[in-house]
């Protein structure tokens, strides 16, 4: 009850009505928002900064079951928290599970990690992306041009080298 009332207090987007599983929102046709369990950064514009995340949770049966049962869902948006706060083994398992859902076509990562922790875009993570049959997109959250240094550029270039489009959100 306390968790629910806390969520209602800080639910500025009125998302509670669209929650289909603990980490899954289905607000718009054809896509779902799959939220990560936590984030490594605190963004001042974050809508979910007070969200009652379940740290350490790496099983997503309810979320995957909901996606599997609704064939109108073609896109999964991995957001936050931040999906890159999950370990490579957890992400690999999640992407593998999503790959097996035949009606899915796209996977979108919304992340700030390439900006704040560019070394997260490492070879093991990139290898996970290459194994997916889904069309992957990245939406990178950038506050200001001064954040775009050489390390960030290299991280983004690693993603682009895989022919993965990158959009920005500020």
Regions found by a protein language model. Name each.
Residues 1-26:
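Flexible, acidic/Gly-rich N-terminal and inter-domain linker regions that tether
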Residues 2-8, 62-69:
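Amphipathic repeat-derived elements
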Residues 8-11, 59, 124:
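Secondary-structure junction/capping motif
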Residues 18-22, 32-34, 60-68:
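Short, charged beta->alpha transition segments
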Residues 28-58, 109:
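Canonical Radical SAM [4Fe-4S] cluster-binding loop centered on the CxxxCxxC motif
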Residues 34, 46, 75-84:
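Conserved catalytic-core segments centered on acid/base and nucleophilic motifs
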Residues 51, 81, 112:
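Flexible loop residues that form catalytic
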Residues 61, 68-71, 75, 84-170:
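Conserved AdoMet/S-adenosylmethionine-binding subsite of the radical SAM
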């Amino acid at each position: 009850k306390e968790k629910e009332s806390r969520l209602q207090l800080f639910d500025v987007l009125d998302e509670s009505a669209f929650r289909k599983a603990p980490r899954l929102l289905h607000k718009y046709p054809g896509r779902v928002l799959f939220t990560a369990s936590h984030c490594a950064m605190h963004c001042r514009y974050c809508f979910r900064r007070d969200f009652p995340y379940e740290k350490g949770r790496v099983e997503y049966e309810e979320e995957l079951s909901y996606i599997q049962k609704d064939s109108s869902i073609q896109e999964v948006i991995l957001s936050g928290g931040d999906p890159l706060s999950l370990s490579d083994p957890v992400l690999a398992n999640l992407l593998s599970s999503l790959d097996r859902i035949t009606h899915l076509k796209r996977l979108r990562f919304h992340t700030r990690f390439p900006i704040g922790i560019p070394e997260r875009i490492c070879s093991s993570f990139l290898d996970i992306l290459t194994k997916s049959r889904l069309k992957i997109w990245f939406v990178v959250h950038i506050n200001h041009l001064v954040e775009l240094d050489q390390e960030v550029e290299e991280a983004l270039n690693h993603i682009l080298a895989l022919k993965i489009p990158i959009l920005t959100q500020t």
